[in-house]
Amino acid sequence: MAKKSKIARDAQRRAVVARYAQRRAELKRIIAAPGSSPEERAAAQQELRRQPRDASATRLRNRDAVDGRPRGYFRKFGLSRVRLRQLAHSGELPGVTKSSW
């Protein structure tokens, strides 16, 4: 189980990313657009730099939905490898069967 403070910090970051996502995408579009003037591009870069660091999606960490474990994360299930194995063996994941060949 991950520390509660780490889980809470990640949840707070997810909220900040969601709040700024639309504006960040708009600024990035202006910066990347070949038709925007150098002044517009510089202004967009400046505003992007002024936004909080936690507004960037790269600062998020994928965590297990049950206990917050940060490593061994399976995107398809939203679980860590440990929790995935535990739930699969107990039959709580529909369609997941033990491999045999």
Curated annotation (Swiss-Prot):
Report the source organism.
Saccharopolyspora erythraea (strain ATCC 11635 / DSM 40517 / JCM 4748 / NBRC 13426 / NCIMB 8594 / NRRL 2338)
Q: Which family does it belong to?
A: Belongs to the universal ribosomal protein uS14 family.
A Pfam family it matches: Ribosomal_S14
The record, for InterPro entries, names: Ribosomal_uS14, Ribosomal_uS14_bac/plastid
* Region of interest (Disordered), residue spans: 31-69
- Describe its function: Binds 16S rRNA, required for the assembly of 30S particles and may also be responsible for determining the conformation of the 16S rRNA at the A site.
Q: Where are the transmembrane segments?
A: none
What UniProt keywords are attached to this protein's entry? Ribonucleoprotein, Ribosomal protein, RNA-binding, rRNA-binding
One GO CC term on file: small ribosomal subunit
Provide the assembly information: Part of the 30S ribosomal subunit. Contacts proteins S3 and S10.
Q: Does the keyword Glycoprotein apply?
A: no
Q: Where is the composition biased (Basic and acidic residues)?
A: 38-53
The UniProt GO MF terms for this protein read: rRNA binding; structural constituent of ribosome
Q: Which GO terms describe its biological process?
A: translation
Q: What is this protein called?
A: Small ribosomal subunit protein uS14A
